[in-house]
Amino acid sequence: MVKNSFISIISQEQEEKEENKGSVEFQVFSFTNKIRRLTSHLGLHKKDFSSQRGLRIILGKRQRLLAYLSKKNRVRYKKLIGQLDIREPKTR
């Protein structure tokens, strides 16, 4: 049972395309869902510092995976960014 319709649409597309749950796209997708869930949780519970730390860790993992994908395959990276509606990280 999926609570969020956005999650179900993207996960169905991922399942139709490939069964590989270890792919970079699927990992970024699952991290994005965790980030959105933790963000809404932290909106209610502002002093939950362990969840804040967990959110920062997941954000870092997603950032590293996106950097890897942008180096390896820029087309798949752009498509994933557009599909998940997340911003590109700032370049230094």
From Swiss-Prot:
It is found in: Plastid, Chloroplast. Its main location: plastid. PROSITE patterns: RIBOSOMAL_S15. One of its GO terms (cellular component) is ribonucleoprotein complex. SMART domains: Ribosomal_S15. Gene3D superfamilies: S15/NS1, RNA-binding. Keywords: Chloroplast, Plastid, Ribonucleoprotein, Ribosomal protein. One of its GO terms (biological process) is translation. Part of the 30S ribosomal subunit. Belongs to the universal ribosomal protein uS15 family. This is Small ribosomal subunit protein uS15c. It comes from Lemna minor. The lineage of its organism: Eukaryota, Viridiplantae, Streptophyta, Embryophyta, Tracheophyta. The gene is rps15-A.
